[in-house]
């Protein structure tokens, strides 16, 4: 019914603007521990993640970490808003959030999935045209016994009006 892009965000004072998928994997698995290892200041990296029960957690693990485990001691947050707040208040912080949650309190990172040849800004346009790599489809599952009750909603959400609502709430 829609697509969701995940943006990697850091504290606004962080000088790092670009990271490769491999560097992100290193950061979130604990192999890279200091920003100086990726071109930043000599500062400890503080990584934030969603809780293990979150679909966002699983998707980031599959897409970015290539199913490697998150580092021990990663700071798990119950909601995206908590990641935004924590990253905005912690100079060495990094986390990932849905594209719709980006605001001026955090700095989005440009990401490369081609070993650093091309870095792409997380934006609705880049996600929609598939230039930005961290994008997942969103599905609506229902029991077929309830199809009569659910079909009007599915028809609406797939209509032009429904898709406008999807975009308005931050999905693609």
Q: How should these model regions be labeled?
A:
Residues 1-172:
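Exported/periplasmic ABC-transporter solute-binding proteins
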């Amino acid at each position: 019914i829609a697509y969701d892009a995940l943006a990697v965000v850091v504290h606004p004072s962080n000088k790092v603007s670009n990271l490769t998928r491999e560097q992100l994997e290193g950061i979130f698995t604990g192999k890279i521990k200091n920003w100086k290892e990726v071109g930043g200041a000599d500062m400890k990296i503080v990584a934030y993640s969603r809780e293990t029960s979150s679909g966002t957690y699983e998707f980031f693990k599959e897409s970015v970490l290539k199913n490697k485990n998150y580092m021990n001691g990663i700071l798990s947050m119950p909601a995206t808003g908590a990641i935004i707040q924590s990253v905005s208040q912690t100079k060495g912080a990094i986390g990932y959030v849905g594209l719709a949650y980006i605001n001026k309190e955090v700095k989005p990172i440009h990401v490369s999935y081609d070993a650093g040849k091309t870095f792409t800004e997380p934006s609705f346009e880049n996600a929609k045209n598939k230039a930005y790599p961290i994008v997942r489809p969103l599905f609506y599952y229902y029991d077929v016994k309830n199809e009569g009750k659910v079909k009007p909603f599915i028809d609406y959400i797939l209509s032009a009006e429904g898709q406008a609502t999807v975009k308005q709430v931050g999905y693609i």
